[in-house]
Amino acid sequence: MSSRARLSRVSIAALLVSVAFSGFARAEMAISANDGKVKLVDGVVQVQKDGKDTVSFIDLDANPPKVVAEIEAPTSVVGPPMSVAVGPKEDFAIVTGAMKVSPADPTKQIPDNKVTVIDLATEGAGIVGTLKKATGIGTPAAPRTPKILATLEAGAGAAGVSINKTGTLALVANRNEGTVSVFTIAGKTLTAAGKVDLGNKDAGPSHVVFTPDGKSALVSRDADHKISVLSIDGAKVEYTKRDMNAGLRPYGLDISGKGDVAVVANIGIGQGDNDTVSVIDMAATPSRVVSTVTVGQTPEGIKMSPDGKFVAVAVMNGSNKPAASPFYKANGLLQVYSRTGTQLAKFAEVPVGKWCQGIAWTSNSRKLAVQCMVDEQVQVFNWNASKLTTAGTVKTTGGPAGIRTAEK
């Protein structure tokens, strides 16, 4: 080999290392939990006897976006669409399953408590594999299909799940027993570390999210209309007895990357009224609800952009109702609100599919993915900080019911 060729290969390797550590060598994945047990037929949920739940791994960097792998794992559309959490290193994910088909009556569902841990490691798609392929030094390993590492138990109706920024603790909201399950994390191994009792077995804890410093968390309680504050010290998690009130049935919940504000989607009672999104001032002592905006019928999904400038909301808009209902609309809505301090203002809106669920942003705040249950697809949009444009549509096996990207 000539010295020029060797130099060229070294230069390529150096360039790839530079690109890799700039965050561009690895595809950005959204993980979608898909409920195959139920379908919505003219506004009525019907249980599917032989339906299979799946988890899809979606490459959002591809043009158009595409599913690169799919495995079976228990999940559920019941509960907020935050039934997925991704480790900060993107090496593992957690998926919860709030409901299962009743063994006694296959036309009905009963609460489940499943927590599935999934290995996401793929050397062939990462920095090492990229360098090997480009430089010819060694043989790159083939990308591995994500695999289930463990299936654990939380509480009845295991729904919203989050992982702290250091990847050492996970919390799961248990809708059917009024508790939050605590799991410690070592590498990719989860260990049950007890439960937090919220003082009301019928509270309906829906989602739980950490503050960026990991010292506290918020829990939405849609059955008794509260948002509770938890304190965290290592693996010790306690209910502080501090509750906030935002609106009817607080459900989806998110906290900004800086931890200065939180947003909560109040889904209401589903009777055709316009529902709301509230902003919580996390910098105040104590934290408190400070503003609310009207968004439309049933804001199921909510997610702040990683740069903290925008809030995306998936509004059902009556698309989940019978066609004969006076509140029925043929499509849902994806809305984007700009944020100034603790105030939100509608900035953009596009129609999406029916009975839409979760939302995920890419880490650069330039793409949005929204799940639509009836259509069994994830719609992906480009976002240039002023306008939403279609980037592509991804089909899933089963109705997409929960979605997340890594939150670093």
For each feature predicted by the language model, list its residue ranges.
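Predominantly soluble domains enriched in secretory-pathway, periplasmic, or organellar proteins
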Residues: 4-6, 19, 23-408
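Hydrophobic helical h-region of N-terminal Sec-dependent signal peptides
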Residues: 11-21
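Bacterial N-terminal signal peptides that target proteins for export
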Residues: 1-13
